[in-house]
Amino acid sequence: AYLRKPYDTLKVYNSALNMCKYYFKCDELAQIPNEKGKIKNKFRRSNSAAILAARPNLINGGIQFFNLDKNKEALDFFATYVDIAINPMFEKENLLQTDTVLPQIAYYASLAAAKMEDYPSVLKYAPYAKEDKEVGKYAMEFISTALKAQGDTVKWIASLKDGIQKYPEHSFFFGHLIDYYSNNNKFDEAMQFADDMLA
């Protein structure tokens, strides 16, 4: 009967987020060997089950904050969702391969980060979305933009070339690469790249 009463959804989402962070820290500390060199992590199974049960609320919380244009909070939720997939607590679940929603959530994490110009977070989360049919090209666009903003020209150019190879119909990569070549009078490199593309 108590479930029929209204409740504060943001509090529920924040509780799920805080629980995940708390259990991550508990697990990290439980993995430290004792004085005999043994690791006794007796709460890992129950904590990981609780995190997996709360994980959908991370998506909901991220979406709610994203829609409120609170990108910092949205990133926190989306990033934690992705971080669960790469946390050692969940090795057996193989979430990077089995979670079909993860690439989209990684995309939203990188989008929220990009809106704040948090380029380290863009570079951490966007790669998980690169292969997605719907959002992969945009994730690669975020990566390129972040690399350029950080002043890493070599990696930026490489990311543009990767983007052209993977998503040739998406004009962002080609346009920026041609702009780079023409603005820096690198016409020979531009011709060589065009020849390589045609080969």
Locations of regions flagged by a protein language model:
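Conserved small-residue packing positions in alpha-helical repeats and bundles
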Residues: 1-4, 62, 110, 143-145, ...
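Canonical positions in the second alpha-helix
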Residues: 26, 81, 128-129, 162-163, ...
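Short coil turns that delineate tetratricopeptide repeat
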Residues: 31, 86, 133-135, 168-169, ...
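Residue at a conserved register position within TPR or TPR-like alpha-solenoid repeats
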Residues: 65, 106, 113, 146-147, ...
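Short coil/linker segments at helix-helix boundaries
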Residues: 1-106, 120
